[in-house]
Each structure stands twice: as C-alpha cells, then as structure tokens.
C-alpha cells in the first residue's frame, strides 16, 4: 500500500505545482558609465504584506554573467528590490506583486548602477528594510530605510515619519499629542532632545498606545491609553553624555549661544541647558517637555536649567510600570520690546462708520526663577503615589507709549498715515473734519508675583476589579503691582485735558481641592468610574487708585487725589462640589462606549466695593454636563471615534454686577446684571486609516458645534467725547460646521504627498456699534465660510530634495445688517523649498510668493516675493557645522493679522528683524559606544 501511495503523492504534488501561479520579475543590471553588464550583483527582495498576521519575506538573487536576473514572487504585497555591488551606489526599486493570483512577467528593464568615487575601495553593503512594518498593534519605523547621512540627528528622521509632526517641542500623531520615550522611559526636554541624539543610536522607533495604569492592573482597556513614540536606543549608547554647543551672529548685533548636555540612562538621566540670545527667543525645559516662543517682536533671553531624574524598578510590580522622581530648578531673564500698529473699523447701523487707529510701543522686563519636581512610584504592587510641584516667582517692569486717534469715516481716504498726520492736521482740512479724538499716553507698571502649585495623588489597585484613589491640589498666587500713567487728550470739539493716574494693586488667589475616585470593573466588558471633588476658592483683590487733571495736585508725576470710582475692594469665596459618573461598555475587542455625566453644585459670594457700588452678590448654581464617546479600533490600522458633549459655562460673577471700570477713561468696561449662562453642544466624528502596504495615512474629522446664549462684547460710542464703552451681552445661538481631511502618502522611495484640507461654515451674531446702551441694540448676523488647504509634494533622491508647497486660506464674511462691510479675504503662500547636498555642503533655498487680497490696509494686499537661502558646511564627521544664512533677500516680509467679528474688523501690523545675514557654528559631542 505504501508503495502505491508514494508515487500517487508525487503525481498530486506535480499537478498542484503546475496549477500555481507567480509573478516573475526580470531585468538586466549594467554599469551606468560604461553601459556594460554587471555580474554578481546582489539583489535583495524584501516583501511585506498586511493581514491577520503581518509578515516580511526576504529573498536574495544574483545577476548572471550577462547581468540578467529573474525573481519569482509567490506572495501578494509590496516588494522592494535593492541592487548593490562593491564599488557602486545602491539602487532601490519598489513594485507590487499579486502573487499566486497572477502569472504576469514584469520586465523591470535596465537597472544602471553608478560607480562610487573610489571604485576599488571595499564597502559594506547592507540590505534595506521597509520604512514601516507592523508588529501586532505597534507601528515600527526602521531608521535604516530612510535617506539619512552620517551624523544626522534623530529630528531629521522624525520629520520623515508619515503621520508624525512636531509643534513647539510637542510631537503629534494624526493630530493627537504623543509622548516621547526612550526604551520605555521619559526623557528630559521631550521632542527637543531629538536634535541632539545621532540617528545611529536608534535601533528602532516604535509607535504604540501605552495602556493606562488602570488597564495594566485590570487587563481591561479603559480607552485612556496614551500615544507613545518609543525610541529604542542601542545598549552601547546608554549611560553616556551627549553634548551640543552652538553660537550664532546676525547683522544688527544679534546673537545666540546655546549649551546643552544630556546623560542618557535608564536609571539616572540628567539634562543641563543654557541659552543666551537677543534674537527674541524664550526657552523652557522640563520633564518630558520643552518649548520655545517669541518674547515679543524683539527680545533678549538668558535661561538656564538643570534636571535630574531617578528611575527604579519595583519587584513584583506589573511590567511597564514607572517609578521615578525628578526635579529641575531654572532661572530666566527676559526683555522684550516692539511696536503695534492697529486699525479697527466698528460697524454702526446704516452707512455710519467709526474708525480707531492705534500705535503702541512697549517694553517688558522679567526675572523668573522657578523650581519643578515630579514623581510617580509604587510603594508596593498595589499602591501608587504621584505628585507634581511648581514654585515660581516673577518680577517685571512694563512701559507702554500709546497714540490713538478716532475718526467718523475711513481716514485713509484723506491721508497715507492718518494717525501721525492727525497731530498736525490744519484746521478745516478733510482729515481734521473727520477727527473726533486723539489720545497720547505713557504707562509704567511694576509687578511682583509668586505662584505655587502642588498636586498629590494616591491610588490603590483592586486587583483585576479596578482602582480607588485620593487626591489633593493646592494653587496659591500672590501678586502686587504699581501703575503710573500720563495721558494727553485732544478733540476738535474742544475737549482737551491732561490726566495723571497712579494705582497700587495687591491680590491673593488661593484654591484647594480634595477628591476621591473609584474605578470598578464589574466584568471584562463593563466599568463604572465615580469621582467626587470638593473645592474651596478664596480671592482678595485691593486697588488704591489716584487721578488728577490739575498739575497743581501732582507731586513727582504722581497724583494725590483719590479716585473712588476706580479704587476697589473685592472678596470672593466659592464652595464647589463636583460629582462625575462615568461608564465604559466594551461590546467586543474593537468597539467600546464611554459616557460621563458631571454634576457641579457651587455656591459663590462676592463682597464688592467700588465707588458708589457697595454690594454683596450671591449665586447658587447646579450644572449638568453629559458626554458620550463611541470608539472603534482595529489595531493601529483603523479607528472611528464618534463623540457628543454638552457643556454649560457660567459667566464670572463679577461680570454680572453693574460695575464700571474707567481706569482707561476712553475705553470703559462695564458689567451686565442680565448676563445668562452659555450652553455648548459639540458633535465630532474622527476616522483614521493606515495602509502600511501603500505607505498611506488618512485622517478624516467632521464636527458640528451649537452654542446657546453665546457671550459677545457690545460697544457704545460717544462721538463728541471719543469714549467707547463695552460690556458683555448674550446673542442668539451660534452654529458651526467643520470638515477636515489629512492625506499623507509615500509614493515609492522618493516621493511623498501630504495634503491637509479644512472647511468651516459658521453663523454668529454681534451687536452694531451703538451710541446709547439705554436704546435697543441692532443685531448683525454674520455668515462665515473658511477654507484652508495646505499641500506639499516632496521629492528626495540621493543629494537632492525638492518640495513645492501651497498654503491657501479663503475667508468669506457676509454681514446681514451692514453689507458695506462684506469682505472676501484671500491669503495664498506658494513656494518651492530646495535642499541640495554635495559632499560636506548643504544648500537650502526657500522662495515663495505670499499673496493677500481684500484687506483694509491696502499696502498689505498684492504679491510679496520672499526668499531665504542657507549654506551649511559639515565637518568632523558631520558632528560640526558652519551655517551662513541670508533672510528675506527682497526685504518684503511683514507681520500682519486680521480679526473679523460681527461688530468690528481689526487689522494689526508689527515690525520684526526679518531681514538679516547670520553665521553660526554648532558642534555635537557624541560619546564613543562601547561594543559589548
């Protein structure tokens, strides 16, 4: 019987083999210079697929004596061929195979390999991996598959990862914030450290969702996981010091010096950083975060910090638990200055108009020492303690010099610079006839402020059932300020006067809370979470204010007459109790429903004394805020989030009092006793889809918002005195619809297309500028449509990178009651960024055309060609670099912004140092890895 089965099996095997199909890839490899066939070329085919189990198949082939090769591919999926030979540059070709579903013969044609500069030098040839692979629910990025140079830092690699972006030191994945870790541990400075570590130190980069502490202990997903970008650092790069130093010199005597040292360690990481510059950059570093922001339009910064952290493991604790404590003192000294130019068009009923022009030159000085500490650790396998401490002191000085002028018609019809010319406009001239008021003021303010914040939490895990926790939080702020000013007011209507003002202000703001929380799983599919928090808040505010219009009563530029209308004493006490009931229902491994219902009960009391207003206001309120979220997740490849929430917002109790603040006599703020609470509805649908085979990442978001009783600012204007009054008021409901699509795809090896489109439709209301608040106000419905499209197509190959891009924004405003103010605003920035690398040189060019249309300040409309270039020379194995930069070659850059409301339209402009030449030097200090 066995003798019969054996030949029968062989026959069946042959028949089955003949029935199989496969794609056949073939071609010829030649020398690009001599055009001669190359034999013995290594051809590595790496194929990846997507299914229930992710897989990668690698096969090696060799060209024959005539340069020919043949590769049979049995599986369906993306396939990457790498052609390499000693003395030649490697070439990579990406294709797709349909495997056994096809029997195509794919002719890849002629593949030409370019010889290296030293043809006979022996080189190491390594196989290329795909950029992205999947390992369960983890996205794995392979650094060796990206186009990188020796000495490149990790930030260069991160910018190439599909779906990952960096904003001010914070990393995002598909618009959601992610936390940076190294070997599963937090690192000081967050994403900022990416510019310091070499790519060669990274083995792999993993993107995954880190479970919450509750999920780790219960084994049930509670939907509160955090996106994590985990850089797997090679062991021989740990417990080493990495350093960075840079110096930059600009024209106009600007400079910047940076020093940074980091010790990567799984147990005791340390980071020290210092920054000295007058290029208008403020810096701050902390545990797992870093940020940089402009101080002002011009500025100086001196900043230094040292951060230390200790990590340890607890025997018996769940895998992946974190135990650490860190602290970091810092000192910052900042000076900022600049000038704002502002034009505001207030909308009146009919064809009437009111224009306000302002020029404000300001200077700021701050000294800010601070101390931060954070810790989280397990005392045993079931109890966790965490805290966060921040202590900060700020001492500052401010000076403002402001010039304002108000007109009853568009002043740009009568002068090119109406604000400056209004001071000397001759009597009877058109500009003088439409001038209603001019104000020149000088204000000096000195401040001192102390801030303390402390959070402490204890959690006890109830095995697989859940967690019980207690927490307390305290915030304390003590501030003191002194203000002195001089104001000169003139008007064609005969209202001319000088005013001196002085005030010293002190305040204490203290807030403490105690909370308890219970999260309990009834089974693996249903969890209930209950939180109760009791909060007490105390506010004391005192202001002694003096004002004189007669120089006789002014002593040393300080008035001596008390101004009771602006002297105040305020005491506010608040008791608030918040109860939150949350549930989580898991229908299966992919689908879950989360719901929350909050009940906030609070009692407020305010004792307020200001001028003739001496009152005690009390408010007792109960607020219910529900929220529902439906989540569907198919691993890392696809997800749906559908959410709805309802929120009630109470106006500040002070804003509901009939007070009047005339500290600025030309811009008076008032309260409104009839102010109602706001109610917000928000519906949102978010869908994410990842196609690793196509290197495609998609994100779609749809949302609808509805606001009941929205609060806006209403304005009243007296043309004879030039005084504006404003107070908060409710309007009819607002509506807004939003749609957003983010498309990010790698096209083969060298191309990448990224397009982010956003459209928003909104309808809101405001009140036209009135002349008397005692008269009925006129509503002005506003319909707005906004479309934004940010698209870039990047090409990277060998030493060339080209990126054409366009950033387009269109705003359409339609006012029902003041159609004269309808506008269509366009901002389009179209350009080309080019990076060319040759040996140790890198040339960067960014030339673009910034087009604006529809703005009131006519000089900002039209085309503005902008061009920046930069040349960098790398040396010392790419660890050091000299950079020469020329910014705004055509001297056409401007800083311009626009804000349109239902009651006004404001345009602002300010100057910065946008045109300069700079030279900088930077050096990376990398340790030598120990090969174990």
Model-derived features with residue positions:
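Short, acidic Ser/Thr/Gly-rich low-complexity loop/linker segments typical of extracellular
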Residues: 50-68
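A short, solvent-exposed loop/turn motif at the edges and junctions
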Residues: 49-52, 56, 78-97
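Periplasmic plug
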Residues: 167-215, 228-233
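Structural motif
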Residues: 28-39
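Short, acidic, small-residue-rich periplasmic hinge/interaction motif at the N-terminus
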Residues: 44-48, 84-86, 103-147, 166-168, ...
């Amino acid at each position: 019987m066995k003798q019969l089965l054996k030949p029968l099996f062989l026959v069946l095997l042959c028949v089955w083999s003949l029935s199989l199909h496969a794609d056949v890839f073939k071609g010829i490899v030649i020398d690009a210079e001599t055009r001669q066939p190359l034999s013995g070329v290594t051809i590595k085919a790496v194929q990846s697929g997507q299914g229930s189990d992710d897989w990668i198949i690698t096969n090696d082939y060799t060209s024959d004596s005539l340069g020919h090769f043949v590769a049979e591919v049995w599986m369906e999926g993306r396939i990457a061929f790498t052609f390499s030979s000693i003395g030649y540059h490697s070439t990579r070709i990406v294709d797709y195979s349909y495997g056994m579903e096809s029997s195509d013969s794919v002719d890849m044609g002629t593949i030409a390999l370019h010889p290296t500069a030293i043809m006979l030098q022996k080189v190491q040839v390594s196989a290329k991996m795909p950029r992205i692979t999947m390992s369960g629910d983890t996205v794995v990025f392979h650094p060796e598959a990206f186009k990188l140079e020796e000495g490149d830092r990790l930030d260069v690699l991160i910018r190439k990862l599909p779906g990952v972006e960096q904003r001010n030191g914070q990393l995002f994945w598909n618009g959601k914030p992610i936390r940076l870790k190294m070997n599963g541990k937090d690192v000081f400075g967050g994403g900022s450290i990416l510019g310091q570590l070499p790519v060669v130190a990274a083995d792999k980069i993993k993107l995954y969702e880190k479970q919450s502490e509750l999920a780790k202990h219960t084994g049930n997903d509670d939907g509160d996981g955090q996106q994590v970008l985990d850089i797997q650092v090679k062991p021989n790069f740990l417990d080493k010091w990495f350093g960075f130093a840079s110096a930059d010199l600009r024209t106009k005597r600007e400079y910047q010096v940076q020093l940074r040292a980091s010790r990567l360690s799984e147990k005791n990481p340390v980071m020290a950083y210092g920054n000295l510059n007058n290029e208008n950059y403020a810096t701050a570093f902390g545990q797992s975060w870093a940020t940089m922001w402009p101080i002002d339009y011009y500025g100086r910064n001196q900043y230094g910090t040292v951060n230390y952290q200790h990590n340890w493991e607890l025997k018996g604790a769940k895998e992946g638990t974190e135990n650490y404590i860190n602290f970091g003192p810092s000192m910052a000294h900042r000076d900022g200055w600049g000038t704002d130019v502002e034009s505001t068009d207030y909308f009146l009923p009919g064809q009437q108009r009111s224009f306000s022009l302002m020029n404000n030159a300001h200077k700021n000085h701050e000294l800010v020492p601070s101390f931060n500490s954070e810790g989280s650790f397990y005392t045993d396998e079931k109890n966790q303690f965490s805290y966060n401490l921040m202590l900060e002191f700020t001492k500052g000085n401010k000076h403002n010099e402001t010039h304002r002028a108000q007109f009853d018609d568009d002043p740009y019809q009568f002068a090119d610079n109406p604000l400056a010319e209004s001071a000397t406009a001759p009597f009877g001239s058109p500009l003088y006839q439409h001038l209603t008021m001019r104000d020149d003021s000088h204000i000096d303010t000195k401040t001192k402020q102390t801030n303390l914040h402390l959070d402490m939490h204890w959690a006890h895990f109830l095995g697989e059932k859940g967690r019980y926790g207690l927490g307390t939080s305290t915030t304390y702020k003590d501030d003191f300020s002194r203000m002195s000013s001089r104001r000169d007011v003139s008007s064609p209507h005969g209202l001319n006067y000088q005013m001196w003002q002085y005030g010293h202000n002190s305040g204490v703001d203290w807030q403490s809370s105690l909370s308890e929380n219970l999260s309990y799983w009834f089974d693996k599919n249903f969890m209930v979470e209950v939180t109760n928090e009791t909060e007490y808040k105390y506010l004391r505010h005192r202001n002694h204010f003096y004002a004189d219009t007669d120089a006789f009563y002014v002593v040393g530029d300080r008035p001596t007459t008390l101004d009771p209308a602006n002297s105040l004493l305020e005491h506010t006490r608040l008791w608030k109790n918040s109860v939150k009931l949350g549930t989580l229902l898991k229908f299966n491994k992919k689908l879950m429903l989360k719901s929350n219902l909050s009940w906030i009960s609070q009692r407020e009391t305010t004792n307020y004394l200001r001028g003739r207003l001496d009152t005690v206001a009390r408010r007792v309120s109960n607020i219910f805020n529900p929220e529902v979220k439906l989540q569907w997740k198919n691993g890392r490849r696809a997800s749906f989030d559908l959410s709805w929430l309802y929120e009630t917002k109470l106006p500040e109790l002070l804003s509901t009092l009939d007070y009047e603040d005339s500290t600025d006599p030309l811009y008076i703020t008032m309260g409104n006793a009839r102010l109602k609470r706001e109610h917000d509805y928000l519906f949102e649908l978010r869908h994410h889809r990842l196609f690793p085979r196509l290197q495609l990442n998609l994100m779609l978001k749809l949302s609808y918002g509805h606001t009941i009783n929205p609060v806006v600012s209403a304005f009243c204007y007296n043309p004879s005195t030039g005084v504006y009054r404003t107070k908060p008021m409710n309007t009819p409901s607002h509506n807004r619809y939003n749609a957003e699509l983010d498309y990010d795809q790698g096209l083969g090896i060298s191309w990448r297309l990224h397009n982010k489109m956003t459209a928003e439709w909104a309808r809101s209301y405001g009140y036209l500028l009135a002349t008397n608040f005692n008269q009925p106000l006129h509503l002005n419905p506003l319909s707005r449509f906004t479309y934004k499209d940010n698209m870039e197509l990047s090409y990277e190959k060998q030493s060339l990178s080209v990126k054409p891009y366009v950033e387009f924004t269109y705003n359409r405003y339609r006012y029902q009651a003041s159609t004269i103010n309808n506008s269509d605003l366009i901002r389009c920035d179209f350009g080309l960024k080019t990076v060319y690398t040759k040996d140790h040189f890198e040339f960067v060019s960014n030339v673009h055309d910034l087009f604006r249309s529809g703005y009131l300040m006519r000089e900002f409309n039209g085309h503005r060609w902008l061009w920046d270039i930069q040349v960098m020379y790398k040396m010392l194995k790419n660890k050091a670099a000299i950079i020469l930069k020329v910014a705004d070659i055509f001297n056409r850059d401007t800083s311009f912004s626009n804000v349109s409301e239902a009651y006004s339209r404001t345009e602002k402009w300010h100057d910065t140092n946008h045109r300069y030449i700079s030279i900088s030097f930077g050096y990376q200090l990398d340790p030598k890895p120990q090969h174990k």
